[in-house]
């Protein structure tokens, strides 16, 4: 018969597990007086008690008065204990407390147990499981011990809240705790939250620790105007340490049953995710609905990278019906991209196949973007060395595909030489290049040249000074810089009216675009230029740490000749561009601000403007205010905040409001409250749909420590782009 040694430190382990969350008090440790009488059985099971009797003939001993039994990490405390040595069986009564080798504690008034096998049962009692997440505890009408690391609770309650705080508990007919497999399995389980039943599960399993396990996750609940009440019950498949899958049946009251699936994988040099959604016979739409999104990224050695991003939907209304943000619902073209990139010390190479799914079939075929099947790029990647001649090269070959209109391939070459001269007080960079465009076209039209080409030289001269002085603002020592900059660009005119337009457009004017060698974006035009950019920047740098506290910049382009290459075709006769100014400030008290202005002096008004203000005194305290204006198009406010309202209560909110149209574009608001063993979140949303209709949604999320989440508010509205603002006013870009 095996002996056993007393392990008194296991109670402390249970207390430490429950105290992992600082908001949860640790359970009180047991304190027992020293025993006066000690009995040691021949099998080295140690028993202490005030009194005991023993029958050598039957091998049965009885102990009374503060009894303590120890054996192989197990301890039993009681006022009465009967030990049958031949059967290795004990019967204990009156204030019985069993502590096993894992630190789990069971308290009852009756215990029958075979010590070697750990099989037996108790009467009504309570339990604390130190080896589980947060130190789970509860009570049961009967506790059955079915071997080491396996316990079955009958008509039981289970919670991870501290003693005396039954905020939530799982009420079950049968709960099996398999600590070797790290799984809790419940039959006929009800989740009660402050005594109110909120969910019923005929079957439920959950991990006892923080390790990933297969099984049902807690349901997600919500309601939207588009789909009505929502209930989703995810099932998680822990397939391997490096990949998993979640299958989610999602019931939508107005639409039917939708299936969602998320597959994730991770390797040493790769990672990816596949999302699938399928809704057979949408009750509102009257047809099958589906969506997919595949993302994959992989590296091959130190220089090669592959990226795959493919997505698609079944119909034009899918994003409108199921997208949870305005920017998603408003998409008209879904990008599809497969790319391989090489980045070496001298050259960078890229090969890409890309296309789009046009979500709205009403968009005319001639207004849809071209697919690039394929696109090849080659550029020099070495940084320019100062005070020496540097060869540069940019090359691109693209095959443009579309069902209608002109298609074909385009070759774009731009070899060049750069001579950067640099000194601490200034710089001067001269550059010459030759740009060559050549096409091989299909469906060019009767009499049109199917292999047009054009070549033009490019010359630029970019120079600036760095002037500085010491100054003080508000008693703070600062270095102020003054950085005048001139950029001259000359590109001769070449007739390009016969060239196709696959991807070229006019970008929004920005401070950086004042110094571009091509005022157009895309590769179909070599824009003629004879112009000079004059710009001035001043910075205020903190003498203490060198940090930039304030930056102001203004610039303008002066034209010495009319621009004859334009999109759309025509001649631009203006003698100067709009003024472009920007400012950025990092102020005391954790305040940051950024502003942009494009001023049209001919009309005496702003063409574009934006302003963003951010206050962030702590990581969990942030408030943003933004304003954006585009003449005749957009004037809107954007405000967001994440702020604690108390030690456990926090607010998250965002709203975008159109001043031009006097209406809300999109709003989110969420309140969250967390205690040591549960958290609750209420999330409400409202966004514009179809240009005129407001769509409302509400989601409820209850997170129970040790079980999971009951409901789940969509993460994207509150986590993606909500609490930060762009550095510059977004560009609308150019279209093809």
Task: Please provide the spans of the model-predicted regions.
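Bacterial N-terminal signal peptides
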Residues: 2-15
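N-terminal targeting/secretion presequences
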Residues: 3, 18-35, 157, 309, ...
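N-terminal functional modules and adjacent low-complexity/disordered segments of proteins
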Residues: 5-6, 26, 42, 201
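Short linear sequence elements within intrinsically disordered, low-complexity coil regions
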Residues: 11, 35-36, 88, 507, ...
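Short, Lys/Arg-rich amphipathic segments at extreme N-termini
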Residues: 11-12, 49-51, 465-467
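Hydrophobic alpha-helical elements and their junctions with loops/disorder across both membrane
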Residues: 12-19, 437, 491
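Post-signal-peptide, soluble extracytosolic/periplasmic N-terminal scaffold domains
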Residues: 19-147, 233, 237-239, 265, ...
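Outer-membrane beta-barrel proteins and related beta-barrel translocases across Gram-negative bacteria
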Residues: 104-121, 125-159, 163-174, 178-736
